[in-house]
């Protein structure tokens, strides 16, 4: 077994019949074909619904390392569906994924996903359960004729990068200490409550002294 990451370098003492227990990878090409056939079978089975599955929300990756990027999440939160005017049980039937555990921590993400839901709803061609008796909200016969199965992802998410022009670095930027500033900001956030408590106690003591 090859050494992995920054662990201790092992001294493997192979006493058992280890050559029979070596993990092989001979099924990789056949597995690739099997996955492709399964994707095609699923696309045929769920047609004319999108082959890639339901609509996913735009979420920001966690941690400082990746939070500049956005990607597809698991499902839309209940608040997003409520603002968009879609019932949580209806959402799953019209190709919208729902994740009741997700919470919206900022207005920007909520608005972006509500807009995404509204855009999807406007583009959606909804087939009636009974072709002879279409209900309110179902697409017209002309729209149904135009319906084709979408092969790629539904409303793909793209990371947009704004290119900055080259310019001269200012003296203020040269003197700015990024790491120290981040440490200070974290410390201030951590000690905010303790400092507020101490300030309150000090103010109370001053009032008592004046009395």
Curated annotation (Swiss-Prot):
<dbReference type="GO" id="GO:0005829">
    <property type="term" value="C:cytosol"/>
</dbReference>
<comment type="similarity">
    <text>Belongs to the eukaryotic ribosomal protein eL13 family.</text>
</comment>
<feature type="cross-link" description="Glycyl lysine isopeptide (Lys-Gly) (interchain with G-Cter in SUMO2); alternate">
    <location>
        <position position="174"/>
    </location>
</feature>
<comment type="subunit">
    <text>Component of the 60S large ribosomal subunit (LSU).</text>
</comment>
<feature type="modified residue" description="Phosphoserine">
    <location>
        <position position="52"/>
    </location>
</feature>
<feature type="modified residue" description="N6-acetyllysine; alternate">
    <location>
        <position position="177"/>
    </location>
</feature>
<feature type="modified residue" description="Phosphoserine">
    <location>
        <position position="77"/>
    </location>
</feature>
<dbReference type="InterPro" id="IPR018256">
    <property type="entry name" value="Ribosomal_eL13_CS"/>
</dbReference>
<keyword id="KW-1017">Isopeptide bond</keyword>
<dbReference type="GO" id="GO:0006412">
    <property type="term" value="P:translation"/>
</dbReference>
<dbReference type="InterPro" id="IPR001380">
    <property type="entry name" value="Ribosomal_eL13"/>
</dbReference>
<keyword id="KW-0832">Ubl conjugation</keyword>
<dbReference type="GO" id="GO:0022625">
    <property type="term" value="C:cytosolic large ribosomal subunit"/>
</dbReference>
<feature type="cross-link" description="Glycyl lysine isopeptide (Lys-Gly) (interchain with G-Cter in SUMO2); alternate">
    <location>
        <position position="177"/>
    </location>
</feature>
<feature type="cross-link" description="Glycyl lysine isopeptide (Lys-Gly) (interchain with G-Cter in SUMO2)">
    <location>
        <position position="145"/>
    </location>
</feature>
<keyword id="KW-0689">Ribosomal protein</keyword>
<keyword id="KW-0963">Cytoplasm</keyword>
<feature type="modified residue" description="N6-acetyllysine">
    <location>
        <position position="16"/>
    </location>
</feature>
<dbReference type="GO" id="GO:0003723">
    <property type="term" value="F:RNA binding"/>
</dbReference>
<feature type="cross-link" description="Glycyl lysine isopeptide (Lys-Gly) (interchain with G-Cter in SUMO1); alternate">
    <location>
        <position position="174"/>
    </location>
</feature>
<protein>
    <recommendedName>
        <fullName>Large ribosomal subunit protein eL13</fullName>
    </recommendedName>
</protein>
<keyword id="KW-0007">Acetylation</keyword>
<keyword id="KW-0597">Phosphoprotein</keyword>
<dbReference type="Pfam" id="PF01294">
    <property type="entry name" value="Ribosomal_L13e"/>
</dbReference>
<dbReference type="GO" id="GO:0003735">
    <property type="term" value="F:structural constituent of ribosome"/>
</dbReference>
<comment type="function">
    <text>Component of the ribosome, a large ribonucleoprotein complex responsible for the synthesis of proteins in the cell. The small ribosomal subunit (SSU) binds messenger RNAs (mRNAs) and translates the encoded message by selecting cognate aminoacyl-transfer RNA (tRNA) molecules. The large subunit (LSU) contains the ribosomal catalytic site termed the peptidyl transferase center (PTC), which catalyzes the formation of peptide bonds, thereby polymerizing the amino acids delivered by tRNAs into a polypeptide chain.</text>
</comment>
<feature type="cross-link" description="Glycyl lysine isopeptide (Lys-Gly) (interchain with G-Cter in SUMO2)">
    <location>
        <position position="123"/>
    </location>
</feature>
<keyword id="KW-0687">Ribonucleoprotein</keyword>
